[in-house]
Protein backbone atom coordinates (compact mmCIF):
# COMPACT_ATOMS: atom_id res chain seq x y z
CA UNK A 1 0.00 0.00 0.00
CA UNK A 2 2.77 2.31 0.89
CA UNK A 3 4.51 1.33 -2.21
CA UNK A 4 1.47 2.17 -4.28
CA UNK A 5 1.15 5.53 -2.62
CA UNK A 6 4.80 6.31 -3.03
CA UNK A 7 4.66 5.24 -6.66
CA UNK A 8 1.61 7.44 -7.24
CA UNK A 9 3.35 10.42 -5.69
CA UNK A 10 6.46 9.82 -7.71
CA UNK A 11 4.42 9.40 -10.87
CA UNK A 12 2.56 12.63 -10.08
CA UNK A 13 5.81 14.40 -9.50
CA UNK A 14 7.21 13.14 -12.76
CA UNK A 15 4.08 14.12 -14.58
CA UNK A 16 4.13 17.60 -13.07
CA UNK A 17 7.74 18.04 -13.96
CA UNK A 18 7.07 17.01 -17.54
CA UNK A 19 4.10 19.35 -17.76
CA UNK A 20 6.24 22.16 -16.36
CA UNK A 21 8.99 21.42 -18.84
CA UNK A 22 6.50 21.40 -21.70
CA UNK A 23 4.98 24.64 -20.62
CA UNK A 24 8.46 26.18 -20.30
CA UNK A 25 9.28 25.14 -23.81
CA UNK A 26 6.09 26.65 -25.08
CA UNK A 27 6.95 29.91 -23.30
CA UNK A 28 10.47 29.80 -24.70
CA UNK A 29 9.16 29.32 -28.20
CA UNK A 30 6.79 32.25 -27.79
CA UNK A 31 9.67 34.38 -26.48
CA UNK A 32 11.89 33.44 -29.39
CA UNK A 33 9.08 34.20 -31.76
CA UNK A 34 8.57 37.62 -30.16
CA UNK A 35 12.31 38.33 -30.27
CA UNK A 36 12.44 37.48 -33.95
CA UNK A 37 9.46 39.71 -34.55
CA UNK A 38 11.07 42.59 -32.63
CA UNK A 39 14.36 42.09 -34.45
CA UNK A 40 12.63 42.12 -37.82
CA UNK A 41 10.62 45.22 -36.91
CA UNK A 42 13.80 46.98 -35.65
CA UNK A 43 15.67 46.15 -38.82
CA UNK A 44 12.77 47.44 -40.90
CA UNK A 45 12.62 50.64 -38.86
CA UNK A 46 16.39 51.16 -39.12
CA UNK A 47 16.27 50.53 -42.84
CA UNK A 48 13.41 53.00 -43.23
CA UNK A 49 15.28 55.65 -41.24
CA UNK A 50 18.46 55.05 -43.27
CA UNK A 51 16.54 55.39 -46.49
CA UNK A 52 14.84 58.54 -45.17
CA UNK A 53 18.20 60.08 -44.14
CA UNK A 54 19.73 59.24 -47.51
CA UNK A 55 16.73 60.70 -49.28
CA UNK A 56 16.88 63.90 -47.20
CA UNK A 57 20.62 64.22 -47.78
CA UNK A 58 20.20 63.78 -51.51
CA UNK A 59 17.41 66.34 -51.51
CA UNK A 60 19.54 68.86 -49.55
CA UNK A 61 22.53 68.30 -51.82
CA UNK A 62 20.33 68.81 -54.82
CA UNK A 63 18.99 72.07 -53.38
CA UNK A 64 22.50 73.34 -52.57
CA UNK A 65 23.74 72.35 -56.00
CA UNK A 66 20.87 74.22 -57.62
CA UNK A 67 21.57 77.27 -55.44
CA UNK A 68 25.29 77.18 -56.33
CA UNK A 69 24.40 76.90 -59.98
CA UNK A 70 22.14 79.94 -59.67
CA UNK A 71 24.88 81.90 -57.81
CA UNK A 72 27.44 81.00 -60.45
CA UNK A 73 25.09 82.13 -63.19
CA UNK A 74 24.43 85.40 -61.35
CA UNK A 75 28.17 86.05 -60.86
CA UNK A 76 28.82 85.30 -64.49
CA UNK A 77 26.10 87.74 -65.46
CA UNK A 78 27.58 90.41 -63.16
CA UNK A 79 31.05 89.87 -64.62
CA UNK A 80 29.67 90.14 -68.12
CA UNK A 81 27.83 93.35 -67.23
CA UNK A 82 30.95 94.77 -65.55
CA UNK A 83 33.04 93.98 -68.60
CA UNK A 84 30.47 95.74 -70.74
CA UNK A 85 30.57 98.84 -68.52
CA UNK A 86 34.38 98.84 -68.54
CA UNK A 87 34.40 98.61 -72.29
CA UNK A 88 31.94 101.49 -72.48
CA UNK A 89 34.12 103.58 -70.14
CA UNK A 90 37.22 102.80 -72.17
CA UNK A 91 35.40 103.88 -75.29
CA UNK A 92 34.24 107.09 -73.55
CA UNK A 93 37.77 107.84 -72.31
CA UNK A 94 39.20 107.21 -75.74
CA UNK A 95 36.68 109.65 -77.18
CA UNK A 96 37.52 112.27 -74.53
CA UNK A 97 41.25 111.83 -75.05
CA UNK A 98 40.75 112.21 -78.76
CA UNK A 99 38.66 115.35 -78.19
CA UNK A 100 41.29 116.79 -75.82
CA UNK A 101 44.03 116.09 -78.33
CA UNK A 102 42.05 117.93 -80.97
CA UNK A 103 41.37 120.81 -78.57
CA UNK A 104 45.06 120.98 -77.60
CA UNK A 105 45.97 121.12 -81.24
CA UNK A 106 43.53 123.99 -81.77
CA UNK A 107 44.93 125.80 -78.69
CA UNK A 108 48.50 125.36 -79.92
CA UNK A 109 47.48 126.69 -83.29
CA UNK A 110 45.76 129.70 -81.66
CA UNK A 111 48.83 130.39 -79.50
CA UNK A 112 51.09 130.36 -82.52
CA UNK A 113 48.64 132.60 -84.35
CA UNK A 114 48.51 135.05 -81.41
CA UNK A 115 52.31 135.04 -81.13
CA UNK A 116 52.61 135.91 -84.79
CA UNK A 117 50.03 138.70 -84.42
CA UNK A 118 51.79 139.98 -81.30
CA UNK A 119 55.09 140.01 -83.15
CA UNK A 120 53.53 142.00 -85.98
CA UNK A 121 51.97 144.45 -83.48
CA UNK A 122 55.30 144.94 -81.68
CA UNK A 123 57.00 145.61 -85.00
CA UNK A 124 54.33 148.14 -85.94
CA UNK A 125 54.54 149.74 -82.49
CA UNK A 126 58.32 150.05 -82.76
CA UNK A 127 57.93 151.56 -86.23
CA UNK A 128 55.36 154.08 -84.93
CA UNK A 129 57.61 155.00 -82.00
CA UNK A 130 60.50 155.62 -84.38
CA UNK A 131 58.29 157.80 -86.58
CA UNK A 132 57.08 159.79 -83.54
CA UNK A 133 60.66 160.23 -82.34
CA UNK A 134 61.73 161.46 -85.78
CA UNK A 135 58.77 163.86 -85.99
CA UNK A 136 59.05 165.24 -82.42
CA UNK A 137 62.81 165.13 -82.11
CA UNK A 138 62.47 163.40 -78.70
CA UNK A 139 63.18 159.84 -77.65
CA UNK A 140 60.57 157.76 -75.86
CA UNK A 141 62.32 158.14 -72.50
CA UNK A 142 62.67 161.92 -72.94
CA UNK A 143 58.94 162.27 -73.68
CA UNK A 144 58.06 160.12 -70.67
CA UNK A 145 60.30 162.22 -68.40
CA UNK A 146 58.71 165.46 -69.63
CA UNK A 147 55.19 164.16 -68.94
CA UNK A 148 56.15 162.79 -65.52
CA UNK A 149 57.90 166.02 -64.52
CA UNK A 150 54.91 168.10 -65.57
CA UNK A 151 52.42 165.92 -63.68
CA UNK A 152 54.70 165.80 -60.66
CA UNK A 153 55.13 169.58 -60.65
CA UNK A 154 51.39 170.21 -60.89
CA UNK A 155 50.63 167.60 -58.21
CA UNK A 156 53.18 169.08 -55.82
CA UNK A 157 51.81 172.57 -56.37
CA UNK A 158 48.20 171.48 -55.74
CA UNK A 159 49.24 169.37 -52.76
CA UNK A 160 51.21 172.25 -51.26
CA UNK A 161 48.21 174.58 -51.52
CA UNK A 162 45.98 172.01 -49.82
CA UNK A 163 48.58 171.28 -47.15
CA UNK A 164 49.12 174.96 -46.35
CA UNK A 165 45.39 175.58 -46.10
CA UNK A 166 44.85 172.48 -43.95
CA UNK A 167 47.75 173.41 -41.68
CA UNK A 168 46.36 176.91 -41.14
CA UNK A 169 42.88 175.62 -40.38
CA UNK A 170 44.20 172.88 -38.11
CA UNK A 171 46.45 175.32 -36.26
CA UNK A 172 43.59 177.75 -35.63
CA UNK A 173 41.30 174.94 -34.51
CA UNK A 174 43.93 173.31 -32.30
CA UNK A 175 44.81 176.60 -30.60
CA UNK A 176 41.17 177.39 -29.91
CA UNK A 177 40.36 173.90 -28.61
CA UNK A 178 43.50 173.73 -26.49
CA UNK A 179 42.82 177.11 -24.88
CA UNK A 180 39.17 176.28 -24.17
CA UNK A 181 39.77 172.82 -22.74
CA UNK A 182 43.10 173.45 -21.03
CA UNK A 183 41.50 175.58 -18.31
CA UNK A 184 38.92 172.95 -17.31
CA UNK A 185 41.05 169.86 -17.83
CA UNK A 186 44.65 170.55 -16.85
CA UNK A 187 43.60 171.83 -13.42
CA UNK A 188 42.11 168.41 -12.68
CA UNK A 189 45.27 166.36 -13.22
CA UNK A 190 48.66 166.13 -11.56
CA UNK A 191 51.57 164.74 -13.58
CA UNK A 192 55.18 164.03 -12.88
CA UNK A 193 57.81 166.08 -14.69
CA UNK A 194 61.01 164.37 -15.78
CA UNK A 195 63.88 165.40 -18.02
CA UNK A 196 65.90 162.98 -20.10
CA UNK A 197 69.63 163.38 -20.58
CA UNK A 198 71.93 161.58 -22.93
CA UNK A 199 74.89 161.44 -20.52
CA UNK A 200 75.40 159.81 -17.14
CA UNK A 201 78.39 159.50 -14.84
CA UNK A 202 79.63 156.64 -12.70
CA UNK A 203 81.66 157.39 -9.59
CA UNK A 204 84.94 155.51 -9.12
CA UNK A 205 86.71 154.75 -5.83
CA UNK A 206 89.98 156.03 -7.31
CA UNK A 207 91.55 157.00 -10.63
CA UNK A 208 93.38 153.67 -10.86
CA UNK A 209 90.04 152.06 -11.67
CA UNK A 210 90.05 153.94 -15.01
CA UNK A 211 93.01 151.89 -16.18
CA UNK A 212 91.28 148.66 -15.19
CA UNK A 213 88.17 149.73 -17.08
CA UNK A 214 90.26 150.43 -20.19
CA UNK A 215 92.10 147.10 -19.83
CA UNK A 216 95.16 145.80 -21.60
CA UNK A 217 95.38 147.43 -25.04
CA UNK A 218 91.84 148.76 -24.48
CA UNK A 219 90.14 145.34 -24.67
CA UNK A 220 87.84 145.94 -21.69
CA UNK A 221 86.44 149.26 -22.89
CA UNK A 222 86.08 147.86 -26.43
CA UNK A 223 84.13 144.91 -25.06
CA UNK A 224 81.90 147.28 -23.06
CA UNK A 225 81.18 149.58 -26.00
CA UNK A 226 80.58 146.64 -28.36
CA UNK A 227 78.21 144.75 -26.07
CA UNK A 228 76.30 147.78 -24.78
CA UNK A 229 76.40 150.18 -27.70
CA UNK A 230 77.21 153.20 -25.53
CA UNK A 231 80.15 155.57 -25.62
CA UNK A 232 82.37 155.23 -22.52
CA UNK A 233 84.27 158.52 -22.03
CA UNK A 234 87.31 158.39 -19.76
CA UNK A 235 88.88 161.84 -19.42
CA UNK A 236 90.51 163.99 -16.74
CA UNK A 237 87.37 164.10 -14.59
CA UNK A 238 88.55 162.88 -11.17
CA UNK A 239 87.10 159.58 -9.95
CA UNK A 240 84.36 159.46 -12.56
CA UNK A 241 83.56 157.89 -15.92
CA UNK A 242 81.06 159.51 -18.30
CA UNK A 243 78.58 157.46 -20.34
CA UNK A 244 77.24 159.06 -23.52
CA UNK A 245 74.38 157.39 -25.37
CA UNK A 246 71.24 158.63 -27.12
CA UNK A 247 69.32 155.44 -26.26
CA UNK A 248 68.28 155.67 -22.58
CA UNK A 249 67.91 151.89 -22.28
CA UNK A 250 71.50 151.36 -23.37
CA UNK A 251 72.60 154.26 -21.17
CA UNK A 252 70.97 152.64 -18.13
CA UNK A 253 72.47 149.28 -19.11
CA UNK A 254 75.95 150.84 -19.35
CA UNK A 255 75.59 152.68 -16.03
CA UNK A 256 74.44 149.65 -14.06
CA UNK A 257 77.06 147.43 -15.71
CA UNK A 258 79.91 149.81 -14.84
CA UNK A 259 78.67 150.26 -11.26
CA UNK A 260 78.53 146.51 -10.76
CA UNK A 261 81.95 145.93 -12.32
CA UNK A 262 83.51 148.67 -10.18
CA UNK A 263 81.93 147.27 -7.01
CA UNK A 264 82.95 143.70 -7.84
CA UNK A 265 86.49 144.60 -8.92
CA UNK A 266 86.75 141.84 -11.52
CA UNK A 267 86.94 143.53 -14.92
CA UNK A 268 87.75 141.41 -17.96
CA UNK A 269 85.86 140.54 -21.19
CA UNK A 270 84.30 137.32 -19.87
CA UNK A 271 83.11 139.01 -16.67
CA UNK A 272 81.83 141.98 -18.70
CA UNK A 273 79.71 139.64 -20.84
CA UNK A 274 78.28 137.98 -17.72
CA UNK A 275 77.41 141.28 -16.03
CA UNK A 276 75.88 142.72 -19.22
CA UNK A 277 73.69 139.61 -19.47
CA UNK A 278 72.53 139.89 -15.85
CA UNK A 279 71.87 143.63 -16.03
CA UNK A 280 69.96 143.16 -19.29
CA UNK A 281 67.65 140.74 -17.47
CA UNK A 282 67.21 143.28 -14.65
CA UNK A 283 66.25 146.03 -17.10
CA UNK A 284 63.80 143.68 -18.79
CA UNK A 285 62.22 143.11 -15.36
CA UNK A 286 61.99 146.88 -14.83
CA UNK A 287 60.32 147.24 -18.23
CA UNK A 288 57.75 144.62 -17.25
CA UNK A 289 57.14 146.20 -13.83
CA UNK A 290 56.69 149.72 -15.23
CA UNK A 291 54.24 148.47 -17.83
CA UNK A 292 52.19 146.63 -15.22
CA UNK A 293 52.35 149.62 -12.85
CA UNK A 294 50.91 152.14 -15.32
CA UNK A 295 48.16 149.70 -16.30
CA UNK A 296 47.30 149.19 -12.62
CA UNK A 297 47.37 152.93 -11.86
CA UNK A 298 44.94 153.66 -14.70
CA UNK A 299 42.74 150.64 -13.86
CA UNK A 300 42.95 149.17 -17.36
CA UNK A 301 42.29 145.45 -17.73
CA UNK A 302 42.85 142.79 -20.38
CA UNK A 303 45.95 144.20 -22.08
CA UNK A 304 48.09 141.73 -24.01
CA UNK A 305 51.55 140.97 -22.58
CA UNK A 306 53.20 142.49 -25.67
CA UNK A 307 51.37 145.77 -25.11
CA UNK A 308 52.34 145.83 -21.42
CA UNK A 309 56.00 145.28 -22.35
CA UNK A 310 55.77 147.99 -25.01
CA UNK A 311 54.45 150.43 -22.38
CA UNK A 312 57.31 149.45 -20.09
CA UNK A 313 59.83 150.31 -22.80
CA UNK A 314 58.27 153.76 -23.05
CA UNK A 315 59.50 154.35 -19.48
CA UNK A 316 63.02 154.73 -20.91
CA UNK A 317 61.97 156.68 -24.03
CA UNK A 318 61.60 160.40 -24.53
CA UNK A 319 60.09 162.59 -27.23
CA UNK A 320 61.24 166.19 -27.42
CA UNK A 321 62.54 165.75 -23.87
CA UNK A 322 59.17 164.49 -22.58
CA UNK A 323 59.07 160.99 -21.09
CA UNK A 324 56.85 158.98 -23.42
CA UNK A 325 55.31 156.79 -20.72
CA UNK A 326 54.47 159.83 -18.58
CA UNK A 327 53.07 161.52 -21.68
CA UNK A 328 50.93 158.46 -22.47
CA UNK A 329 49.65 158.29 -18.90
CA UNK A 330 48.90 162.03 -18.89
CA UNK A 331 47.12 161.70 -22.24
CA UNK A 332 45.02 158.83 -20.87
CA UNK A 333 43.93 160.91 -17.86
CA UNK A 334 43.06 163.91 -20.05
CA UNK A 335 41.24 161.69 -22.54
CA UNK A 336 39.16 160.05 -19.82
CA UNK A 337 38.05 163.46 -18.49
CA UNK A 338 37.20 164.71 -21.99
CA UNK A 339 35.26 161.52 -22.78
CA UNK A 340 33.14 161.90 -19.66
CA UNK A 341 32.36 165.51 -20.55
CA UNK A 342 31.45 164.54 -24.12
CA UNK A 343 29.31 161.54 -23.04
CA UNK A 344 31.64 159.03 -24.73
CA UNK A 345 32.93 155.72 -23.38
CA UNK A 346 35.76 156.78 -21.01
CA UNK A 347 37.20 153.24 -20.80
CA UNK A 348 37.73 152.99 -24.57
CA UNK A 349 39.15 156.53 -24.81
CA UNK A 350 41.51 155.98 -21.87
CA UNK A 351 42.71 152.71 -23.38
CA UNK A 352 43.34 154.30 -26.79
CA UNK A 353 45.09 157.31 -25.22
CA UNK A 354 47.42 155.09 -23.21
CA UNK A 355 48.32 153.01 -26.28
CA UNK A 356 48.51 155.85 -28.83
CA UNK A 357 52.35 155.95 -28.75
CA UNK A 358 52.85 152.20 -28.25
CA UNK A 359 54.65 152.07 -31.61
CA UNK A 360 57.52 154.06 -30.06
CA UNK A 361 58.11 151.13 -27.70
CA UNK A 362 59.11 148.89 -30.60
CA UNK A 363 62.82 148.63 -31.29
CA UNK A 364 62.50 149.07 -35.05
CA UNK A 365 60.73 152.46 -34.82
CA UNK A 366 62.53 155.68 -33.94
CA UNK A 367 61.09 157.77 -31.13
CA UNK A 368 59.46 160.44 -33.25
CA UNK A 369 59.04 158.65 -36.54
CA UNK A 370 55.71 159.30 -38.22
CA UNK A 371 55.43 155.56 -38.82
CA UNK A 372 55.00 154.76 -35.15
CA UNK A 373 51.23 155.39 -35.31
CA UNK A 374 50.62 152.81 -38.04
CA UNK A 375 53.04 150.34 -36.46
CA UNK A 376 51.40 150.75 -33.06
CA UNK A 377 47.95 150.24 -34.60
CA UNK A 378 49.09 147.02 -36.28
CA UNK A 379 50.51 145.78 -32.97
CA UNK A 380 47.28 146.64 -31.13
CA UNK A 381 45.21 144.87 -33.78
CA UNK A 382 47.36 141.74 -33.55
CA UNK A 383 46.85 141.82 -29.76
CA UNK A 384 43.07 141.77 -30.11
CA UNK A 385 42.21 145.43 -29.43
CA UNK A 386 38.89 146.78 -30.74
CA UNK A 387 38.59 148.56 -34.09
CA UNK A 388 37.87 151.88 -32.34
CA UNK A 389 41.12 151.66 -30.35
CA UNK A 390 43.13 150.54 -33.41
CA UNK A 391 41.81 153.41 -35.54
CA UNK A 392 42.40 155.95 -32.76
CA UNK A 393 46.05 154.85 -32.50
CA UNK A 394 46.59 154.95 -36.27
CA UNK A 395 44.85 158.31 -36.69
CA UNK A 396 46.38 160.30 -33.84
CA UNK A 397 48.85 161.89 -36.31
CA UNK A 398 46.26 161.98 -39.14
CA UNK A 399 48.08 159.30 -41.11
CA UNK A 400 44.68 157.68 -41.57
CA UNK A 401 41.23 159.21 -41.32
CA UNK A 402 39.63 159.17 -37.84
CA UNK A 403 36.52 157.01 -37.94
CA UNK A 404 35.03 157.83 -34.52
CA UNK A 405 34.69 160.62 -31.99
CA UNK A 406 36.95 158.62 -29.69
CA UNK A 407 39.79 158.98 -32.22
CA UNK A 408 39.28 162.76 -32.29
CA UNK A 409 39.41 162.88 -28.48
CA UNK A 410 42.70 160.97 -28.54
CA UNK A 411 44.15 163.57 -30.94
CA UNK A 412 43.00 166.41 -28.69
CA UNK A 413 44.33 164.79 -25.50
CA UNK A 414 47.67 164.09 -27.19
CA UNK A 415 47.91 167.69 -28.40
CA UNK A 416 47.06 169.10 -24.95
CA UNK A 417 49.67 166.94 -23.21
CA UNK A 418 52.35 167.79 -25.77
CA UNK A 419 51.58 171.51 -26.08
CA UNK A 420 51.55 172.51 -22.42
CA UNK A 421 54.47 174.84 -21.58
CA UNK A 422 57.67 173.03 -20.62
CA UNK A 423 56.49 169.61 -21.75
CA UNK A 424 58.93 169.19 -24.62
CA UNK A 425 62.28 170.37 -25.98
CA UNK A 426 63.23 170.37 -29.63
CA UNK A 427 67.02 170.01 -29.55
CA UNK A 428 67.22 166.68 -27.71
CA UNK A 429 64.66 165.11 -30.01
CA UNK A 430 66.52 166.19 -33.17
CA UNK A 431 69.74 164.78 -31.77
CA UNK A 432 68.09 161.45 -30.97
CA UNK A 433 66.42 161.29 -34.38
CA UNK A 434 69.71 161.88 -36.16
CA UNK A 435 71.47 159.09 -34.27
CA UNK A 436 68.54 156.74 -34.68
CA UNK A 437 68.49 157.46 -38.42
CA UNK A 438 72.12 156.39 -38.63
CA UNK A 439 71.26 153.05 -37.05
CA UNK A 440 68.20 152.56 -39.25
CA UNK A 441 70.31 153.04 -42.39
CA UNK A 442 72.74 150.35 -41.22
CA UNK A 443 69.93 147.96 -40.24
CA UNK A 444 68.47 148.25 -43.77
CA UNK A 445 71.36 146.12 -45.14
CA UNK A 446 71.28 142.33 -45.07
CA UNK A 447 73.61 140.59 -42.62
CA UNK A 448 73.67 143.38 -40.00
CA UNK A 449 73.04 141.95 -36.52
CA UNK A 450 73.63 144.98 -34.28
CA UNK A 451 74.37 148.63 -34.89
CA UNK A 452 75.40 151.40 -32.49
CA UNK A 453 75.77 155.10 -33.26
CA UNK A 454 78.43 156.48 -30.90
CA UNK A 455 80.71 159.49 -30.52
CA UNK A 456 77.70 161.83 -30.81
CA UNK A 457 76.90 160.42 -34.24
CA UNK A 458 80.41 160.72 -35.63
CA UNK A 459 80.88 156.92 -35.76
CA UNK A 460 78.66 153.94 -36.52
CA UNK A 461 79.80 150.53 -35.29
CA UNK A 462 78.14 147.61 -37.05
CA UNK A 463 78.31 143.97 -35.96
CA UNK A 464 77.61 141.62 -38.88
CA UNK A 465 76.78 137.91 -39.20
CA UNK A 466 80.03 136.16 -40.08
CA UNK A 467 78.09 133.38 -41.84
CA UNK A 468 76.62 135.86 -44.35
CA UNK A 469 79.35 138.52 -44.57
CA UNK A 470 82.95 137.55 -45.36
CA UNK A 471 85.99 139.84 -45.37
CA UNK A 472 85.47 140.97 -48.97
CA UNK A 473 81.76 141.66 -48.41
CA UNK A 474 82.60 143.61 -45.24
CA UNK A 475 84.55 146.15 -47.30
CA UNK A 476 81.70 146.51 -49.81
CA UNK A 477 79.13 146.74 -47.00
CA UNK A 478 81.00 149.57 -45.27
CA UNK A 479 81.28 151.44 -48.58
CA UNK A 480 77.55 150.97 -49.38
CA UNK A 481 76.46 152.13 -45.92
CA UNK A 482 78.70 155.20 -46.15
CA UNK A 483 77.26 156.08 -49.58
CA UNK A 484 73.69 155.72 -48.30
CA UNK A 485 74.46 157.95 -45.30
CA UNK A 486 75.92 160.58 -47.66
CA UNK A 487 72.83 160.41 -49.88
CA UNK A 488 70.13 160.49 -47.19
CA UNK A 489 71.53 162.61 -44.34
CA UNK A 490 72.96 166.08 -43.80
CA UNK A 491 75.68 166.51 -41.19
CA UNK A 492 78.80 168.55 -40.54
CA UNK A 493 82.22 166.91 -40.86
CA UNK A 494 82.37 163.17 -41.53
CA UNK A 495 80.97 159.94 -40.10
CA UNK A 496 83.14 156.87 -39.54
CA UNK A 497 81.61 153.50 -40.50
CA UNK A 498 83.19 150.52 -38.70
CA UNK A 499 82.31 146.92 -39.60
CA UNK A 500 82.99 144.31 -36.88
CA UNK A 501 83.02 140.66 -37.93
CA UNK A 502 83.72 138.16 -35.16
CA UNK A 503 84.10 134.36 -35.19
CA UNK A 504 83.71 132.80 -31.76
CA UNK A 505 84.33 129.09 -31.11
CA UNK A 506 83.41 127.58 -27.72
CA UNK A 507 84.35 124.10 -26.49
CA UNK A 508 84.29 122.58 -23.02
CA UNK A 509 86.96 120.34 -21.46
CA UNK A 510 85.36 117.60 -19.38
Curated annotation (Swiss-Prot):
Q: Which Pfam families match?
A: HD, KH_1, RNase_Y_N
Enzyme class name = hydrolase
Q: Name one GO biological process term.
A: mRNA catabolic process
Q: Can you say what this protein is called? A: Ribonuclease Y
| Alphabetized GO MF terms | RNA binding; RNA endonuclease activity
Locations listed in the record: Cell membrane
Q: Write out the entry's keywords from A to Z.
A: Cell membrane, Endonuclease, Hydrolase, Membrane, Nuclease, RNA-binding, Transmembrane, Transmembrane helix
What is the membrane topology here?
Single-pass membrane protein
Look up the EC number in the record and give it: 3.1.-.-
Q: Which SUPFAM superfamilies match?
A: Eukaryotic type KH-domain (KH-domain type I), HD-domain/PDEase-like
Source organism per entry reads Borreliella burgdorferi (strain ATCC 35210 / DSM 4680 / CIP 102532 / B31)
List the NCBIfam families hit by this protein, alphabetically.
HDIG, RNase_Y
Q: Which residues form the HD domain?
A: 324-419
Q: Which residues cross the membrane?
A: 2-22
Name the domain of life this protein comes from: Bacteria
The record's similarity note reads: Belongs to the RNase Y family.
Q: Which InterPro entries match?
A: HD/PDEase_dom, HD_domain, HDIG_dom, KH_dom, KH_dom_type_1, KH_dom_type_1_sf, Ribonuclease_Y, RNase_Y_N
Quote the CDD domains the UniProt record gives. Answer: HDc, KH-I_RNaseY
Q: What does this protein do?
A: Endoribonuclease that initiates mRNA decay.
GO CC list: plasma membrane
